Curated annotation (Swiss-Prot):
Gene name in the database record: TIM21
Protein name as it appears in the record: Mitochondrial import inner membrane translocase subunit TIM21
Subcellular location: Mitochondrion inner membrane
Organism this protein belongs to: Kluyveromyces lactis (strain ATCC 8585 / CBS 2359 / DSM 70799 / NBRC 1267 / NRRL Y-1140 / WM37)
KW DNA repair (keyword) present: no
Protein role: Essential component of the TIM23 complex, a complex that mediates the translocation of transit peptide-containing proteins across the mitochondrial inner membrane. Required to keep the TOM and the TIM23 complexes in close contact. At some point, it is released from the TOM23 complex to allow protein translocation into the mitochondrial matrix.
Length: 234
């Protein structure tokens, strides 16, 4: 049993107040303990076991179909990625490679634009402050802008020394005249860019103008049966 102390004011005979302490017993109330009983159902256990059996008993054909679909999708993605890589490489090699047709064409057009004789033959309207810009395009001559932007005609061949030669032909046009430029370039041993071997301009009614004259190779004559008879010449 526990006691609780309470202070209570009291009045004495003389009229003064004083406090008295009282001890009151405390009775503890009973505490109820609740027991929780968890029930177990055999129905849930049987249902879980049935779901596991259904998962294990998946037919073979859906598995094969899912595997085939996944494999085909993977092959398709890998093939598309590889094809895109090849296309990007070809475009990059064509546009940025020193031996690409685009680079050779741009170099040839710059040579024609900077050649005074070619500009005079094309009757360019040049002044002291400005120069006329030439037009350069492919083989087909039409008024259609999309047709003019077709690729330049070019061919490549390998010579006896194993070096690659580049042959190109394109048109240049001013406001008054039009001409055809023939270009031949050869793989260089020193530079990354091919070296121009020959370049000339043909304008109707004008004499052929060589921007770069080809070097004539001297062929030594051979004697009887391929042997040069007689004394050796220095």
């Amino acid at each position: 049993m526990f006691c609780q102390f309470i202070s209570r004011p009291a009045q004495s005979l003389s009229g003064k107040f004083s406090s008295k302490t009282l001890c009151l017993p405390l009775i503890a109330s009973p505490v109820r303990i609740k027991h929780t009983v968890q029930g177990y159902s055999t129905f849930n256990a049987q249902q879980n076991a049935g779901n596991k059996q259904q998962k294990k008993k998946i037919p073979l054909w859906p598995r094969i179909r899912a595997f085939t679909t996944f494999t085909f999708s993977g092959i398709l993605v890998i093939g598309a990625t590889g094809l895109a890589g090849v296309v990007i490489y070809l475009i990059g090699a064509e546009l940025f490679s020193p031996s690409g047709d685009t680079q050779i064409f741009n170099r040839a057009v710059s040579k024609v634009e900077n050649d005074e004789v070619a500009r005079r033959l094309l009757k360019c309207n040049d002044t002291e402050t400005s120069t006329e810009r030439l037009k350069a395009y492919g083989e087909i001559l039409t008024d259609d802008r999309w047709t003019r932007n077709r690729p330049i005609s070019s061919t490549r061949r390998i010579d006896k020394e194993g070096k690659e030669h580049y042959l190109m032909r394109f048109h240049v046009e001013s406001k008054q005249k039009m001409g055809i430029v023939h270009v031949e370039a050869k793989e260089s041993d020193v530079n990354y860019q091919p070296d121009f071997v020959s370049m000339y301009l043909d304008i109707p009614g004008e004499k052929r103008h060589y921007l770069i004259k080809p070097k004539l190779s001297i062929v030594k004559p051979k004697g009887f049966l391929g042997v040069n008879w007689g004394p050796k010449r220095d």
